[in-house]
Amino acid sequence: MAEQNLGPRDFFAKEDAIADLGLIACPGAEELCKLVDSHLVRWAREVGNTDVDSFIIPSDCPRFQSGDAKGLVKASTRGDDLYIFVDPGNYSVTYQLLGYENHLSPDDHFQNLMRLIQAVAGRAHRISVIMPSLYGGRQHRRVSRESLDCAFALQQLRDVGVKNIITFDAHDPRVMNAVPTMSFDNVMPTYQ
């Protein structure tokens, strides 16, 4: 089988585009999102699409004094092919609650992801989630009466309209069996 070399033109040709591309970063995943955006903008310019400065759609997850939060998407995503970045393992993100500095837990990151998906309100053409470390991925099989958080989270994402999950080095990639009709890409770092 011949090796196929794809270039920027294969991804940014207007005649082949199904939907406009949009990137959304959950709190804590902004750096990764900006890195991906810089590559995409460079590739788009290489094929003559000079009117694109960024594919990032501004968003935020502000917190109230009660600790509750809300998801805000600050531009239209109608008809876009969205890629939402979330890093559940990033403990450096903090917020103030009752005068104390709190760090976001993996549960907080997952809820921020769900909030931003809700803020899109089903208007995107397709939603893909890029999650470098799979939420709940270390607990992949039931030993006694315990929850299967990763499988349940994947099912929740499917139920709110996510079509693709992209993760890196999942602890047990068989967790994709929880959502057999959804695309699940487990990129292994050893391929690089």
Give the residues covered by each predicted segment.
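PRPP-associated nucleotide enzymes
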Residues: 1-192
